[in-house]
Amino acid sequence: MTDATFGFDSAFLHRLERLSLLNRRPLQGPSAGPRRSPRHGASVEFADFRTYVTGDDFRRVDWNAYARLDRLFLRLYRAEEITVVTIFLDHSTSMQFGDPKKSFIAGKLAAILSYIALHNYDTVAIAGWGDGIDRFLPGQSGKKAVPRVWRTIAQLVDNPVPATNVANLKTYGKYRRGPGIAVVLSDFMTDSDWRSGLRSLRAVGQEVTAIQILAPEEIDPPLRGDWKLVDAETSAGAEVTISPRLLHRYREALERHTKAITEFCRREGIAFAQLRTDVDLNGTVLSDLRAAGILA
């Protein structure tokens, strides 16, 4: 059973609190301009303090607090337009592959992104999906919501469903419409029309991020000789002799598939990143997501 704390310690969570999800679509009104965090808004509703870090706007330093405590603090204000972040977690059976499993890494990443969003006063919704959206946790707000959000993620990781159909992300429109950020976590190992699924999220006002999660054994299979391979989602099997030539053809096919996703996302204005299950989620992955324009 997946630990609903995902093994994160307080030092790592403190690092996450210095990040925000990057919304590439400018907000309208007083919060207009590229958004780093909705609590850096221009409304007059006071929200909280936090410690000053290099690069913060000196105009929001609370000098009274500095005079009392000899430390720099920023006054934070609740933005007038709160961003809704929906994390779509693929919990199909193909995500059970790998050591650690792809589903476990996707769950930890969902926990990381949800924590960052909730810390920044965003609203977070969780959509579990396989053949379609089979579980939906409506928008949760504030850090008090972290345990509930993480429990939902852990339950999805522990309860796989038979198939992946990215095209059925179009059913999200039944749950909500309007501006927001949609983060799709999947291996994208599907014959379904993933293009129409991602486009459908854009059509209902979402700024879309797609993160493909693959196991090293999928990228470079350590197989030779005679095997019976079974499709994780359809249970269809095939007996094959795995030769260097066949492995070469497989790698070429996977590269074409990943290239198609990458180029599609670039054309559609969708942020895209590929992560391996052996990634250091407590370290380099945060830098990778910043480089991909997903975190700021």
Locate predicted features.
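N-terminal juxtadomain amphipathic helix
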Residues: 58-60
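A positional/architectural concept
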Residues: 39-43
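Exposed, interaction-prone extracellular/peripheral surfaces
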Residues: 1-38, 51-56, 65, 70, ...
